[in-house]
């Protein structure tokens, strides 16, 4: 995982209430926090470290709030240099729409992950589509946590475009495959 993404996740943790923040940091461990924070943002951290941080957050806040934390994380990541230029270029080409960004989701995936599967997006209507992740190494990590994280990232994409909408898991397999149904509307 790109260090910038794990750093954005840790920044989102810092915005949580003090009690939750302290529990999460204690579970993660100071050495892991420092390793992530000290890394160059463009470098890659082991996926095991990133998932350890993610799992500790989920263990404290639960599944629903984990999606919210990831929404905040991705909004922070969109504002960092690594993704800001990508988003600017994509919105210049496709316009600032969820569909335009979702069509480029595999490129974002390639920018921030390694060996974490691939994403495909299919538009199913003017303001809806499906996004499918295949090939995530679910046998190595807690897949439910990653599924929630991606859902939060998709929600952040909708919010970035100044739209409202929903992201629902419609299919999830133990083999590292998940499909999301996404709907959005302007304003």
Description of each model-found segment:
Residues 20-32, 71-72, 92, 103, ...:
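Short alpha-helical "patches" and their helix-cap loops
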Residues 1-66:
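N-terminal leader/assembly segments
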Residues 42-149:
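Amphipathic interaction/junction segments at domain boundaries or subunit interfaces
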Residues 30-37, 78-81, 173-185:
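Short, mixed-charge aromatic SLiMs
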Residues 18-22, 33-34, 99, 111-118, ...:
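Intrinsically disordered or highly flexible coil/loop and linker segments, enriched in small
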Residues 3-6, 10, 110-147, 151, ...:
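Short terminal or interdomain "cap/linker" segment that borders an active site or interface and mediates
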């Amino acid at each position: 995982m790109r260090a910038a993404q794990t750093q954005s996740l840790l920044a989102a943790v810092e915005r949580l209430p003090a009690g939750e923040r302290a529990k999460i940091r204690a579970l993660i461990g100071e050495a892991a926090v420092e390793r992530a924070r000290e890394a160059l943002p463009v470098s890659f951290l082991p996926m095991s470290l990133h998932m350890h941080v993610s799992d500790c957050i989920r263990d404290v806040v639960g599944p629903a709030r984990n999606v919210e934390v990831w929404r905040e994380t991705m909004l922070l990541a969109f504002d960092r240099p690594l993704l800001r230029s990508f988003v600017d270029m994509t919105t210049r080409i496709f316009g600032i729409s969820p569909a335009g960004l979702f069509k480029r989701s595999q490129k974002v995936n390639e920018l921030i992950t390694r060996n974490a599967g691939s994403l495909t997006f299919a538009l199913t209507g003017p303001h809806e589509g499906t996004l499918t992740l295949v090939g995530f190494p679910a046998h190595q990590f807690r897949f439910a946590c990653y599924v929630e994280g991606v859902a939060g990232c998709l929600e952040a994409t909708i919010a970035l475009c100044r739209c409202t909408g929903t992201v629902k898991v419609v299919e999830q397999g133990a083999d590292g495959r998940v499909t999301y149904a996404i709907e959005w509307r302007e304003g």
